[in-house]
Design a protein with these regions (language model features):
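Divalent-cation
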Residues: 1-208
Length: 208
């Protein structure tokens, strides 16, 4: 699936530019430290890794809103819900339907048919409640259903462990153009899946 390009605004350009300048500085320092016998370059690599993660998450947060904006107006509600779920480390899996109907791809759970709200999303994913397992489906500005079962990705990562929620998010994005939000219950980290790839994003109340 080909993604439509869009113009970056000045704020995101400046943020990314700042990160890239920091990465460039760290890389230059690393080159200098190669000839220093008493310097551990692993620390430099770790700092660069963190900077790369931060710049990717910053860019992904920006792109996320643009990927969602044509399909739902409920950015604020979703942002608040995802942020609060992340803070509490409550796992979550949210499918936002876009152009393609996803009904044929999921094992349907419990019908909800209610307007999207942060409170409703957080309640559905509260640990121990009957509907907290599985995925919520959002179509336009409506929360259609909960406890849906998604197709798992057949791709197995050899570099790191991927949990069931993340495999389901990737699997769904491999088979449709849907965008899937994921909150890890182990770390609280937030990511989204699109076109078979998983992208980390920063946690904030206005991330979307």
């Amino acid at each position: 699936m080909e993604r439509q390009p869009f113009q970056l605004d000045d704020t995101i350009k400046n943020n990314v530019r700042t990160y890239l300048q920091q990465i460039s500085t760290e890389a230059s320092n690393l080159i200098k430290h190669l000839d220093t016998s008493d310097h551990c370059i692993l620390c430099d690599f770790e700092e660069m890794r963190k900077l790369f993660q931060d710049v990717q998450a910053t860019a992904a947060s920006y792109y996320l809103r643009h990927y969602l904006s044509p399909y739902t107006f409920e950015y604020a509600a979703l942002s608040l819900a995802i942020h609060n779920l992340s803070e509490k480390r409550h796992g979550a899996l949210i499918v936002i339907e876009r152009e393609q109907n996803v009904d044929p791809l999921i094992q349907k759970g419990m019908p909800i048919q209610a307007p999207v709200s942060a409170t409703l999303v957080e309640t559905l994913f509260y640990p121990g409640t009957p509907l907290h397992d599985g995925a919520v489906l959002i179509r336009n500005n409506q929360l259609i259903s909960a406890a849906n079962v998604l197709p798992l990705s057949s791709i197995i990562s050899t570099t790191k462990k991927i949990g069931t929620r993340h495999r389901a998010a990737i699997g769904m994005s491999e088979k449709s153009d849907a965008l899937i939000l994921v909150v890890s219950e182990e770390t609280g980290k937030i990511s989204f899946a699109l076109d078979g790839s998983l992208y980390p994003i920063h946690s904030s109340k206005n991330m979307i």
